Design a protein with these regions (language model features):
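Non-catalytic regulatory/interaction regions at protein termini and inter-domain linkers
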Residues: 1-175
């Protein structure tokens, strides 16, 4: 994933070596957010993001932007049980810290549909590709974990419509 991002940025005209050397660009595949290198550590990930934002602001940057492949983020155990809570806590953190932004990547070929639904309802906007993004009409604020499980047919229909629109692009990022 990191090599692919490096290549994409270079093709877009970013001097990846220079930006990395100055600290303006950090590409990492570290898995410090995993317990025993296998299970997702929700608390550890939130602390890590809070610390990274503080460091960026302290270094004089206007903010921090992050992205992650959610299947990769949960680790090799593929335990998605805390994914929805993480997404809602992350959204709350971003609301409280407008200097923070990012994109959570949900790739349909690696994410079970149940958790894809959770990803869709937990984000107020959907980024499909460089030219297509939208306000998420099925977004549900974190008032109820149960609400993310209700309406599965509605969510599946919405996800299918998104995938139809995106069928020519590679890979699909739903949130």
């Amino acid at each position: 994933m990191v090599a692919g991002m490096r290549s994409y940025l270079a093709a877009a005209g970013v001097d990846v070596a220079e930006e990395s050397a100055t600290g303006r660009l950090v590409l990492s595949s570290d898995r410090d957010h995993l317990i025993d290198g296998c299970r997702f550590d929700l608390e550890g990930m939130m602390r890590s993001l809070e610390e990274a934002l503080k460091e960026a602001l302290h270094a004089g940057f206007a903010g921090l932007w992050a992205t992650g492949d959610m299947t990769w983020e949960v680790g090799p155990d593929k335990d998605f049980s805390t994914l929805l809570e993480y997404e809602w806590r992350l959204e709350e953190f971003i609301r409280e810290n407008p200097q923070m932004g990012g994109v959570c990547q949900y790739h349909i070929e690696t994410m079970p549909r149940k958790f894809l639904r959770q990803g869709v309802v937990s984000h107020p906007s959907i980024f499909m590709n460089q030219t297509l993004s939208m306000i998420n009409p099925v977004y549900r604020y974190s008032d109820s974990f149960a609400s993310a499980q209700s309406g599965a047919p509605e969510l599946d229909s919405f996800i299918n419509r998104i995938l139809e629109r995106q069928s020519m692009a590679e890979p699909q990022n739903l949130t």
